[in-house]
UniProtKB/Swiss-Prot annotation:
The gene is Fto. This is Alpha-ketoglutarate-dependent dioxygenase FTO. Binds 1 Fe(2+) ion per subunit. It is found in: Nucleus; Nucleus speckle; Cytoplasm. Activated by ascorbate. Inhibited by N-oxalylglycine, fumarate and succinate. It comes from Rattus norvegicus (Rat). RNA demethylase that mediates oxidative demethylation of different RNA species, such as mRNAs, tRNAs and snRNAs, and acts as a regulator of fat mass, adipogenesis and energy homeostasis. Specifically demethylates N(6)-methyladenosine (m6A) RNA, the most prevalent internal modification of messenger RNA (mRNA) in higher eukaryotes. M6A demethylation by FTO affects mRNA expression and stability. Also able to demethylate m6A in U6 small nuclear RNA (snRNA). One of its GO terms (biological process) is regulation of cytosolic calcium ion concentration. Monomer. May also exist as homodimer. The modification N6-acetyllysine is found at residue 213. Fe cation binds at residues 228, 230, 304.
Length: 502
């Protein structure tokens, strides 16, 4: 079943088409550090972009972070994600792993990634390898460092804005360390905007990706990651990126004078103002250990892309993920809320309910959908990848599946109730109306997820990475109160509703 684009997606696609039509066969201008106007343009149009050259970052991190990248790569911990774009399942050219606070998730391109936890106090984490544990510890250490640097950068930005000064590109060599500190309230706000709770690690070897797309607006060359805003972040929160390309230092050079535009052998990050065809874009070369920071609302007002070089590259992208609906604690609380309506359980799995109030039933069925499609199916669609690093998610997923199964019994109890003799026509109609939409959505989404697990691209994946259509059961499974395919159930509800209203 083809997913219908959201209004936001349709608007974004329309903007892109209009922009390409305006360009016709011309390229928009962009600047590199060799251009005279580069730093002036950065000063005027990109003042919330902060860059740190590798030489300004502690040598200890430059030793430990690359080792951690290579360790995770050696153990096969990074995976290309199977994402849905415009109704089509495609593998991302970039391999990824999410590391962060235990129980956190991060969603991008309608795909929920689950953290491999970094080692925090009070949480027991069983890693499959001591090397993987050490790597996760390293990224927590990097996270702490980048957090401190981000707060410092935000403080300096606030001082400049308050003084109404012209902002300048904040390269580490000239980065000011003095100044009047912020107020207590401001300090709390700055800390919250740098409270990185996850890092999304990326890896790509361009030699193995010969079909990379060309950058469409400026002619910047091959893109590893297309123009985008980072999704699912706390409003106005910062993003910090540590870049590590695998070439030796002797191969790196800041001399790009022989190239028109950017050096295609060197990785770059590109920036542009969203949907602006007047302001030149920027491309900044990325060498081993360089970092950059997107502060305040830069991620909302500007777009960025990653332009491929010739050598493999890792990056660690630290974010303040918007987790109000994306933590294990959250979804467990939601399950508890839905199951508060259960009066008692019988030995055969049937349940009786406290209330058949339409609002209570509707809420319960919506939570049922949430745990099934935002958690269980998202997790198992990614195969067994998480077990390569840790068993941390095994017990929570078993727990969620048990709670979800009880919700299946709740739905069955509702469907039994509408067939009960003595129920008034009005009550029957209200109950049916309350559950029809969530059950119709459940049926449609089950079809979609089942079809995605059978997609052609899935056949190319190794066994451990193949999507698992879970939960799934056959029609005559005695342990399940309702069928997997709800076509007949939904059809009967519609018929009953028409009958009740006639």
């Amino acid at each position: 079943m083809k997913r219908v684009q959201t209004a936001e997606e349709r608007e974004r696609e329309a903007k892109k088409l209009r922009l390409l039509e305006e360009l016709e066969d011309t390229w928009l201008p962009y600047l590199t550090p060799k251009d005279d106007e580069f730093y002036q343009q950065w000063q005027l149009k990109y003042p919330k972009l902060v860059f740190r050259e590798a030489g300004s970052i502690p040598e200890e991190l430059h030793k430990e972070v690359p080792e951690a990248f290579l360790t995770l790569h050696k153990h096969g911990c990074l995976f290309r994600d199977l994402v849905r774009i415009q109704g089509k399942d495609v593998l991302t050219p970039v391999s990824r792993i999410l590391i962060g606070d235990p129980g956190c998730t991060y969603k991008y391109l309608n795909t929920r990634l689950f953290t491999v936890p970094w080692p925090v106090k009070g949480c027991t984490i069983n890693y499959t390898e001591a090397e993987i544990a050490a790597a996760c510890q390293t990224f927590l250490k990097l996270n702490d460092y980048l957090q401190v640097e981000t707060i410092q950068a935000l403080e300096e930005l606030a001082i400049k804005e308050k003084a109404n000064e012209d902002a300048v590109p904040l390269c580490m060599a000239e980065f000011p360390r003095a100044g009047v500190g912020p107020s207590c309230d401001d300090e709390v706000d700055l800390k919250s905007r740098a409270a990185y709770n996850v890092t999304l690690l990326n890896f790509m070897d361009p030699q193995k990706m010969p079909y990379l797309k060309e950058e469409p607006y400026f002619g910047m060359g091959k893109m590893a990651v297309s123009w985008h805003h980072d999704e699912n972040l706390v409003d106005r929160s910062a993003v910090a990126v540590y870049s590590y390309s695998c070439e030796g230092s002797e191969d790196e050079s800041d001399d790009e004078s022989s190239f028109e535009g950017r050096d295609p052998d060197t990785w770059h990050v590109g920036f542009k103002i969203s949907w602006d065809i007047e302001t030149p874009g920027l491309t900044i070369p990325l060498h081993q250990g360089d970092c950059y920071f997107m502060l305040d609302d830069l991620n909302a007002t500007h777009q960025h892309c990653v332009l491929a070089g010739s050598q493999p590259r890792f990056s660690s992208t630290h974010r303040v993920a918007e987790c109000s609906t994306g933590t294990l604690d959250y979804i467990l609380q939601r399950c508890q809320l839905a199951l508060q309506n259960v009066l008692n359980d019988s030995d055969n799995g049937d349940v009786s309910l406290k209330s058949f109030e339409p609002a209570v039933l509707k809420q319960g069925e919506e939570i049922h959908n949430e745990v099934e499609f935002e958690w269980l199916r998202q997790f198992w669609f990614q195969g067994n990848r998480y077990k390569i690093c840790t068993d941390w998610w095994c017990e929570p997923m078993t727990q969620l599946e048990g709670l979800w199964k009880k919700m299946e019994s709740v739905t069955n109890a509702v469907l039994r109730e509408v067939k009960r003799e003595g129920l008034s026509v009005e009550q029957r109609s209200e109950i049916l109306s309350a559950v029809l939409i969530p059950l119709t959505m459940r049926q449609n989404l089950r079809k979609e997820w089942h079809a995605r697990c059978q997609a052609r691209v899935v056949r190319t994946l190794p066994a451990q990475q193949k999507p698992d259509c879970r939960p799934y059961w056959e029609k005559d499974d005695p342990s399940m109160p309702l069928p997997f395919d709800l076509t007949d159930v939904v059809s009967e509800i519609r018929s009953q509703l028409l009958e009740a209203r006639s």
